[in-house]
Amino acid sequence: MTQILIVEDEQNLARFLELELTHENYNVDTEYDGQDGLDKALSHYYDLIILDLMLPSINGLEICRKIRQQQSTPIIIITAKSDTYDKVAGLDYGADDYIVKPFDIEELLARIRAILRRQPQKDIIDVNGITIDKNAFKVTVNGAEIELTKTEYDLLYLLAENKNHVMQREQILNHVWGYNSEVETNVVDVYIRYLRNKLKPYDRDKMIETVRGVGYVIR
């Protein structure tokens, strides 16, 4: 499931956006403080970030700049600042789109869909000596194929695709088992153990790190 982070200090608007995006089957995290939003953006995986400019602790432009130094996650700025100078600054700092408040929610949703459509799909991933071929549904280490179940494969692909981004258990559950799945989050831990056991003969089991109280990451 697509992961979206909202960084917006106006709580009524933030809750409204969270409700609308959840209704569209996006998985949403919300932060009301600039520094908290930046920390979340840099420590977790997101497909898209919705970012206000006027925030406590650190402003949106600085957040945008710091994110761009480390990753290419799409960013949509939403703000009451309508001057051309502010729009140019936002885009120059790395935002992918700029929407002036007040805005129509349908327009925002359409812009989100447009940005997500433009994101490249990765068919082959090489990480820590492991090659994952999405089209062939195949995982190899130095030419030797590792036999994985579909769930194990999907789990490994998700972590590898988001290398260096900590994936929360709930995020993993939504991506691999589906948003409407009734399984508990501890099933993620069980399948991580299965996956590590299958990677161990190739000395790759330790590449999946546990982030205590949060989830998992491949470094």
Curated annotation (Swiss-Prot):
Q: Which domain of life is it from?
A: Bacteria
Keywords linked to the UniProt accession? Activator, Cytoplasm, DNA-binding, Phosphoprotein, Repressor, Transcription, Transcription regulation, Two-component regulatory system, Virulence
- InterPro entries named among the record's database cross-references: CheY-like_superfamily, OmpR/PhoB-type_DNA-bd, Sig_transdc_resp-reg_C-effctor, Sig_transdc_resp-reg_receiver, WalR-like, WH-like_DNA-bd_sf
SUPFAM superfamilies cross-referenced by the UniProt entry: C-terminal effector domain of the bipartite response regulators, CheY-like
What turns on expression?
A: Activated by Agr, SarA, SarV and MgrA.
Gene3D superfamilies on file: 3.40.50.2300, 6.10.250.690, Winged helix-like DNA-binding domain superfamily/Winged helix DNA-binding domain
Q: Name one GO biological process term.
A: regulation of DNA-templated transcription
Q: How is it modified after translation?
A: Phosphorylated by ArlS.
Descriptive protein name:
Response regulator ArlR
From which source organism is this entry? Staphylococcus aureus (strain NCTC 8325 / PS 47)
